[in-house]
């Protein structure tokens, strides 16, 4: 099978094309979980671009429980193309500057994100088939995906890893109360994610 135009690699510059887009319950960047897995039951659907809607490309994927998604921080793109070496991570309350490479800030030289998600199912029926249903995603609706890889526990898990400043930062979770009338507006399967 021929490869779609992926661009050349001239002097280390590579052009990439989205292979898919993710459909989530987050139409804007506000409200999205800050990290993947923070809302483990929240499902999303991955819809492949036509050149990549080939069931053969997914053969063997059903044997994996988790996936890596490589994607673009599409809502954080700056028109001027500039980046800043220092950012203020929300994990530190937005008050302490840190080097961009010590953070997961979307404002990076190359605005690329990496998320670990749970694979719920592969659907081979429907107009957009095949599609993937995943859980625990931290992406905005319509986010372009550049690659999908299986999560390999024997090499991707590092129990001895340390978390730098993020490990010792305060937990900024808020207690949220949803009135029953508002909960009734949500499908029951999505209520568990709240």
Description of each model-found segment:
Residues 1-116, 122-194:
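Glycine-rich, low-complexity intrinsically disordered segments
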């Amino acid at each position: 099978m021929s490869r779609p135009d992926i661009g050349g690699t001239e002097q280390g510059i590579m052009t990439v094309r989205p292979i898919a887009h993710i459909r989530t319950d987050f139409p804007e960047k506000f409200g999205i979980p800050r990290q993947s897995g923070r809302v483990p039951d929240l499902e999303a659907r991955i819809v492949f671009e036509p050149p990549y809607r080939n069931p053969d490309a997914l053969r063997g994927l059903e044997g994996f429980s988790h996936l890596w998604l490589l994607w673009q921080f599409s809502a954080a793109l700056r028109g001027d193309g500039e980046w800043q070496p220092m950012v203020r991570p929300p994990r530190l309350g937005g008050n302490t500057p840190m080097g961009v490479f010590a953070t997961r800030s979307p404002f990076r030289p190359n605005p690329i994100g990496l998320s670990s998600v749970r694979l719920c199912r592969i659907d081979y029926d429907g107009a957009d088939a095949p599609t993937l249903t995943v859980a625990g995603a931290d992406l905005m609706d319509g986010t372009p995906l550049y690659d999908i890889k299986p999560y390999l526990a024997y090499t991707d898990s590092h129990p001895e890893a340390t978390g730098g400043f993020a490990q010792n930062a305060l937990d900024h979770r808020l207690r949220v109360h949803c009135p029953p009338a508002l909960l009734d507006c949500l499908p029951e399967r999505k209520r568990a994610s709240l």
